Amino acid sequence: MAVRIAACGHDVSVIARGPHLKAIREKGLKLVEAEQEVVATNLVATDVIRDLEPQDLVLLALKAHQIEAVVDDLQALFGPETVMVTLQNGIPWWYFQKLGGPYADRVVRTVDPNGELFNRIDPDRVVGCIAYPAATITEPGVIQHIEGNRFPLGELDGSESSRVADISSLFEEAGFKARVLTDIRSEIWLKLW
């Protein structure tokens, strides 16, 4: 995602570690796809989240079990209007937030055992997103896109906001399919099935 969004001329910062970070800083981040290779050299790359200033949009693409370890650092990325799009597989920590009904605001203990994410990340800044593409790091600084192009997204309360429409437009500008859904939770189950 970072390479495609940066290729559209947007300012992009990435968090990486070790040899991957070193390669990005030295040569840029390369995306290898079936018909083309694109290298983004206009990225800010760091391994220290707190080195970055507040962002307009944060794409949280960590494994669910990795998020709690960085929840304090994520706060540095949040300004008053920052939106965070979550790209985890499975049931997300925010599943019962803004849902209503008898399960409203329950903590999903299997992915957020101590309720840290539930309590520390304001659900008003979260937009849910389901990542269908498959990709892998083939060598430091090189991402191989294997298949898939869909990133359906939606507000946790099912509303059709201007911010989710703007994110969809950004993703589509970068060449992704990004349909806005009024029930993002159903899409989670569709992917899990």
Give each language-model segment a name:
Residues 23, 77, 118-190:
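Internal alpha-helical scaffold of NAD(P)-dependent oxidoreductase catalytic cores
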Residues 30-33, 101-104, 143-146:
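Short, hinge-like loop/turn segments at secondary-structure boundaries
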Residues 7, 16, 72-74, 163, ...:
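Flavin (primarily FAD) cofactor-binding/catalytic cores of flavoenzymes
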Residues 38-42, 46-138:
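Rossmann-like NAD(P)(H) cofactor-binding subdomain of soluble oxidoreductases
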Residues 193:
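Oxyanion-binding "anion nests"
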Residues 1-33:
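NAD(P)+-binding Rossmann beta1-loop-alpha1 motif at the extreme N-terminus of oxidoreductases
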Residues 34-40, 156:
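Active-site-adjacent segment of FAD-dependent monooxygenases/related oxidoreductases
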